[in-house]
Amino acid sequence: MSKNKLSKGQQRRVQANHQRRLRTDRKPELDDSQLGDAQEGIVISRFGQHADVEAVDGTQHRCNIRRTIKSLVTGDRVVWRPGLQAQEGVRVKGIVEAVHERTSVLTRPDLYDGVKPIAANIDQIVIVSAILPELSLNIIDRYLVACETLEVEPLIVLNKIDLLDADGRKFVDGMMDIYRRIGYDVLEVSSQTREGMEAFENALTGRISIFAGQSGVGKSSLLNALLPPTDNEILVNTVSGNSGLGQHTTTAARLYHFQHGGDVIDSPGVREFGLWHLAPEQITQGFVEFRDYLGHCKFRDCSHTNDPGCALREAVEQGKIAEERFDNYHRILESMEQAKPRKTSDSDEK
């Protein structure tokens, strides 16, 4: 037995302690005299072994994290205890005692750890696109595959529509109808003229959202228009020009409150929606309109390219599947192997 592996008895005791800490009505233990009563809260941000927790009354507290808590990310709903005033006049840090079960968890692929959680209890991912620098349906489709795989509801938001003339607006409406026809919600907005912003605010109210999108599409402008003045300095991280899905940064994810209601988690990790860790079958399932045709191809190992009897190809030819989406599906599959990161070996470094 590995020295780090817990026995079944130890695992039961850890679980029992965790369940005990989830009870907010219990009184502080005698050896915890510097801590107050247990109460509910939400993690606003995580910094190494510390977390900022927002109490029910809206106040924020820096807390330590119990060593028995294996995973804690922004958005987690927790039971925590505030630190009391010490004799020297220095307030003791609070402590996160336990984590409630998550309704959802947003993860990103990690080269060494498989997948890494970056935010919890997300209700929707707002996929922000714009006509400038360019309207990329390929990037939208990549984010949609990620949303479907993570089982988080997407909302497509097209920004900067004030820059369109009548013909351009008609063309863009046609492109967005591709997504409306397969059941996705699409909003066309302008953070400058505020066109469409009221509908956008309504879609965000009562939900925890994350914004995703290429650099230059106006994510920061939208967030600054939605957040109160005290919180309107949202960090927008450098995004990869190759994939549009981002590069790793060390900036911590943080939860903010919208003026009209609802919350947003600003997280650099969301720019890392790489798809290289997914199997080709998962990419296929990520295209929702494909699902009715899967399993109906002539050959079980159909590549959905030029194979005879391909049900997907026939659906495209019949106008039941948009050709743009079908083409992007193949582009994503072709790019996956090229984009897949490779661990650096000792021989590579020499």
Swiss-Prot record:
Q: Where is the composition biased (Polar residues)?
A: 1-17
Keyword Metal-binding among record annotations? yes
Q: What is its main location?
A: cytoplasm
Q: Where are the transmembrane segments?
A: none
Q: Print the keywords alphabetically.
A: Cytoplasm, GTP-binding, Hydrolase, Metal-binding, Nucleotide-binding, Ribosome biogenesis, RNA-binding, rRNA-binding, Zinc
Question: Where does the chain bind Zn(2+)?
Answer: 297, 302, 304, 310
Q: What Gene3D superfamilies does this protein map onto? A: Nucleic acid-binding proteins, P-loop containing nucleotide triphosphate hydrolases, Probable gtpase engc, domain 3
Q: Name one GO biological process term.
A: ribosomal small subunit biogenesis
Q: Does the record carry Ligase as a key word?
A: no
Q: Which cofactor does it need?
A: Zn(2+)
Binding locations of GTP: 159-162, 213-221
The entry's localization annotation reads: Cytoplasm
The terms under GO molecular function for this entry are: GTP binding; GTPase activity; metal ion binding; rRNA binding
Residue segments, region Disordered? 1-35
A GO CC term assigned to this protein in UniProt? cytoplasm
- Location of the CP-type G domain: 103-273
Kindly give the CDD domains that the UniProt entry links to this protein: YjeQ_EngC (cd01854)
What does the entry's cofactor note say about binding and number?
Binds 1 zinc ion per subunit.
What do we know about how this protein assembles, alone or with others? Monomer. Associates with 30S ribosomal subunit, binds 16S rRNA.
Q: Which family does it belong to?
A: Belongs to the TRAFAC class YlqF/YawG GTPase family. RsgA subfamily.
Q: Which NCBIfam families is this protein grouped with? A: PRK12288.1, ribosome small subunit-dependent GTPase A
Q: Know the name of this protein?
A: Small ribosomal subunit biogenesis GTPase RsgA
